């Protein structure tokens, strides 16, 4: 059954349904409503109203996204890139990453322990493998080098 989004009430209801499932950014919500056939003017009006009512919040979305991705083992560089691709402002992203309260070094160590069972690399090939994995996950080479050299280990 296809829902027709030809009224402001229908657009608003669909937006609220999406927001009830999880936080969304304005750009992401706009894209989803357009895919469902809503007119751009109605989308803007509905989203402006939801923002005024506090139901749509970029800062809540950023906080939720950063927290979720960090718990999934991703670092700040990867999270920053994903949020940029979702149309969020760089300054807002940087602020959210600074204020999230996550210890990125602890996050790096946890991700490394889960993947590699806490075993430091024994040769250059293994070191490169672990470094590539952690770099892909969004951690800086400086943090990775410090970890893999054994300088930041709590054990």
UniProtKB/Swiss-Prot annotation:
It comes from the Bacteria. GO terms for cellular component: cytoplasm. Keywords: Cytoplasm. The keyword Manganese does not apply. GO terms for biological process: regulation of DNA repair. The keyword Ligase does not apply. Its main location: cytoplasm. InterPro entries: RecX_HTH_1st (IPR053926), RecX_HTH_2nd (IPR053924), RecX_HTH_3rd (IPR053925), Regulatory_RecX (IPR003783), WH-like_DNA-bd_sf (IPR036388). It is found in: Cytoplasm. It holds the Pfam family RecX_HTH3. Belongs to the RecX family. Modulates RecA activity. NCBIfam families: PRK00117.2-1 (NF001054). This is Regulatory protein RecX. It comes from Pseudomonas fluorescens (strain SBW25).
């Amino acid at each position: 059954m296809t829902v027709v989004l030809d009224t402001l009430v229908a657009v608003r209801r669909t937006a609220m349904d999406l927001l009830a499932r999880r936080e969304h950014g304005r750009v992401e919500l706009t894209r989803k409503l357009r895919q469902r056939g809503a007119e751009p003017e109605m989308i803007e009006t509905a989203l402006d109203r939801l923002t005024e009512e506090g139901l749509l919040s970029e800062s809540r979305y950023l906080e939720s996204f950063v927290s979720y991705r960090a718990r999934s083992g991703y670092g700040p560089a990867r999270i920053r890139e994903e949020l940029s691709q979702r149309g969020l402002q760089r300054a807002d992203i940087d602020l959210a990453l600074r204020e999230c309260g996550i210890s990125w070094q602890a996050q790096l160590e946890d991700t490394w322990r889960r993947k590699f069972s806490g075993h430091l690399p024994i040769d250059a090939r293994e070191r490169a493998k672990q470094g590539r994995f952690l770099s892909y996950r969004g951690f800086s080479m400086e943090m990775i080098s410090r970890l893999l050299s054994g300088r930041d280990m709590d054990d």
